């Protein structure tokens, strides 16, 4: 890589609403791969890099916005305590939603492809490659987060309402044929 892409950031985060294996359609929109990246507010270095990349994307987007940065510009970095106060996974965190029409490459800590879809899920921790870009679509102007690749770093408590089968059931003796 000869020139630095100033709009690209590798974001250490907790994955939420992870649609990384199959594209998902939201409200009838075009299906996309997506993830919500939950970033600890104490990770000031990552948050600063994201803010800098958003500023670069704003500057690069002036051409799409008539030569100036609009006052009511939508940006992707949000405060979980303000925008998601009811969701404890977002407490004391910043977050952003990233998406792409193209499937991300998903790798482990050794940068080997992960093929087992159950290995990467909402609640695990990883790093996500994000490229920030300006848009002007149907009168909406802003900076969006483009989903790149994903690296799983470690497991975490799964997010969502689905219960773990081990918590719901106990082993049954094969000789106990209670359905007979």
What are these regions (language model features)?
Residues 1-95:
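OB-fold ssDNA-binding interfaces and closely related basic DNA-contact patches used
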Residues 1-7, 157-180:
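Acidic, gly/ser/pro-rich intrinsically disordered tails
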Residues 18, 101, 131-133:
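Generic short beta-strand segments
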Residues 39-41, 132-134, 154:
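Beta-strand elements of well-folded, non-transmembrane domains
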Residues 98-102, 106-115:
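A beta-strand/beta-hairpin structural motif
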Residues 110-126, 133-143:
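Exposed beta-sheet edge/beta-hairpin loop segments within beta-rich domains
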Residues 137-157:
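OB-fold/S1-family single-stranded nucleic acid-binding modules
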